Structures are given as structure tokens and as C-alpha cells.
Amino acid sequence: VSKSSAVQSFLSQVAATPNRAGNAHLIFALDATASREETWDVARQLQTEMFLSARSLGGLNLQLCYFRGFAEFFSSRWESNADEIVRIMAGMSCEAGATQIERVLAHAINESQVRSVKCVVYIGDAMEENVDVLASLSGKLGLLNIPVFMFQERDDPGARKAFMECARLSGGAYAQFDQASVSHLKELLKAVAVYAAGGFKA
């Protein structure tokens, strides 16, 4: 996982956040296109770890979103039970298609109009869209105080540049997502879950 100043700053911010009860909502979005199929089992294990770590945090509601295939975009119901999200994720499979990051960001903005969306976590490996459009949406999320945490699988330079820009403009953070960084990634994902719940538990 990238030990960037943005990520470290975020972890410091989480540690300083007072614990409080709340009704926070976290959107967890996945690229489920064919390019991720090779590493999907490992990714699913790590993604599941995040939800299980979030289960003990009070006041946290989760929504799973993913895109794949020909313009297929799925968003689950809001769930306070992480097991239900894990069940949905267990049945997922990858299908060839273009990325729909724009749709993820627009969905987060729309959801924020009716409920308290605390942050967005996105995991993907590619970006095949208009960077300016993604930047505009990320900036809007930043104005809404909804940071986007971008985790990148593989090392595509174009995707990395776009992911880092989305994270910067929204006030979030960027990190690598790969098998070699499991321990640090779990630390970051758990920190994101705690941040979304509105507090930090040592």
C-alpha cells in the first residue's frame, strides 16, 4: 500500500476523531470487469475483511456497488449487517466491460442528497473515461465533505494518475491494492470503516 503523505494524513485524522454514535453511510464500490478476474479471489478475501472489521462499529450502514459487462451497474440496499454485503459479494463474478467510475461518483452525490454519506471506498485497476468529468465529480464530493478513497490494483499509470486526482479533489486518499500489501491494506480499510462510523477505537 502506498505510504503517501495523503494516506498517512488520513490515518492521523482518524486517530484524532472523537468516538461518537451516528447513522453514517459508507459506499463501497468495485470494478468487476474482466481485467480483475485473475486476482478476484484474493481481492474478494480482502474486501470481505473490510466488511467484517466494520461489523462491530455502531452506526455504520454499508452499500455495495459494482459495475461490469455492458453498462451493468448494481447498488445494494443499505445494510447495517455486514454479513448481507459479504453474501452479495460472494456471488459476484467478473464480466468484460468498460469502467463506470463516473457512475459511481454520480451515484454517491445522488445518495448524499437523502442520507449522510460519510465516504466512498473504490477498488479498481483501470480507467477508461473522461478524466475531466471524474475530476469535476470528485470536486463536488469534496465540497460535500465526502472523501473518496481510491485503491488501485495493478499499476496502470493512466489509472494511477486519475485515481490520485479523484482522491485529492475529494479530500480522500490513494493507495495500491495488491497481494503483497495485505497487512497495510487491512489497516487502511479498517481505518476507513472507523472514519465512516464517526470515531476511532484503538
Per-region residue spans from a language model:
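Von Willebrand factor
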Residues: 1-76, 81-123, 127-132, 154-164
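Structural recognition of the beta-strand scaffold that forms the well-ordered cores
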Residues: 27-28, 121-122, 147-151, 175-176
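Catalytic-core regions built around general acid/base machinery
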Residues: 50-53, 136-145
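Active-site-proximal beta-strand/loop segments in catalytic clefts of secreted hydrolases
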Residues: 65-68, 123-125, 151-154, 177-179
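Short, structured coil segments at secondary-structure junctions
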Residues: 144, 162, 169-170
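C-terminal "exit" segments of structured domains
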Residues: 170, 174-202
